[in-house]
């Protein structure tokens, strides 16, 4: 499986199917890929309703005919926006789509959708585990540190994508603790240096992770890793 860090929290998984997580392109100052450069997208996963995560879901799902996976409330919102291939889930649920398996995991954050100045309830935020081609990728979404992450060690994660930017999510210290609890084979930091409020040094994070014998890769926007 090829995992590409598009920028911010947007990640592309390419294998037997193509999966796009939190597709934020328009307005993303660090996005290293344009929407027109994407391959065919089979699945879009939205971890929560904030604009930098739900992003361009509607436009891309209509373009590719993608199945969109999110929580129940966001799913209803997207259906009202004209999407008919929406699969709703909730935290703790796992579903086998035949070619991929998806599980939503707890995240501690918000999930409101803001539209024309109005706040729309977006259910509970989530992280997600995607299983494809005998590999498991965990995308934490936006979250603070939580003891629930200890349970993720039972999932035998191949690659964890964790936010390190602080302010709205875990900072480097908390992301390090999370990584110890998750115990993945490899970790990649995300959700940092997009705006001044979430400045962080990914090399500092990887330096801490090196102490616990877990591989850490800093991916610049547009770079990929094979797992």
Residue spans for each PLM region:
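Binuclear metal-ion centers of metallo-dependent hydrolases, dominated by the metallo-beta-lactamase
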Residues: 79-93, 176, 180-227
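Pre-active-site segment of Zn-dependent metallo-hydrolases
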Residues: 12-50, 55-62, 73, 110-120, ...
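Zn-dependent metallo-beta-lactamase
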Residues: 1-20, 25-29, 96-103, 204-212, ...
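Glycine/small-residue-rich loop that forms an oxyanion/phosphate-binding "nest" at active or ligand-binding sites
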Residues: 55-113
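Short active-site oxyanion
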Residues: 1, 62-67, 135-137
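Active-site-proximal loop/helix segments of hydrolase catalytic cores
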Residues: 117-180
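Active-site neighborhood of phospho(di)ester-bond hydrolases with catalytic His/Asp-centered motifs
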Residues: 20-23, 41-49, 69-72, 138-141, ...
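Active-site environment of divalent metal-dependent phosphoester hydrolases
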Residues: 27-28, 50-55, 75-78, 93-96, ...
């Amino acid at each position: 499986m090829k995992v590409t860090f598009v920028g911010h929290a947007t990640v592309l998984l390419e294998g037997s199917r193509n999966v796009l997580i939190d597709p934020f392109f328009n307005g993303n100052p660090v996005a290293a890929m344009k929407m027109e450069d994407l391959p065919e997208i089979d699945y879009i996963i939205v971890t929560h309703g904030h604009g930098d995560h739900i992003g361009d879901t509607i436009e891309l799902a209509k373009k590719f005919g993608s199945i969109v996976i999110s929580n129940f409330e966001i799913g209803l919102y997207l259906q009202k926006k004209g999407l008919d291939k929406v699969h709703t889930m909730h935290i703790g649920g796992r579903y086998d789509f035949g070619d991929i398996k998806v599980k939503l995991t707890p995240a501690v954050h918000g999930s409101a959708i803001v539209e024309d100045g109005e706040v729309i309830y977006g259910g509970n935020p989530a992280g997600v585990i995607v299983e494809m081609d005998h590999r498991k990728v965990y995308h934490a979404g936006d979250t603070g540190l939580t003891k629930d992450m200890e349970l993720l060690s039972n999932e035998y994660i191949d690659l964890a994508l964790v936010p390190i930017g602080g302010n709205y999510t875990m900072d480097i210290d908390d992301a390090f603790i999370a990584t110890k609890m998750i115990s993945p084979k490899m970790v990649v930091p995300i959700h940092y240096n997009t705006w001044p409020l979430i400045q962080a040094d990914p090399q500092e994070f990887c330096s801490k992770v090196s102490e616990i014998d877990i591989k850490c890769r800093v991916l610049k926007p547009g770079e990929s890793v094979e797992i």
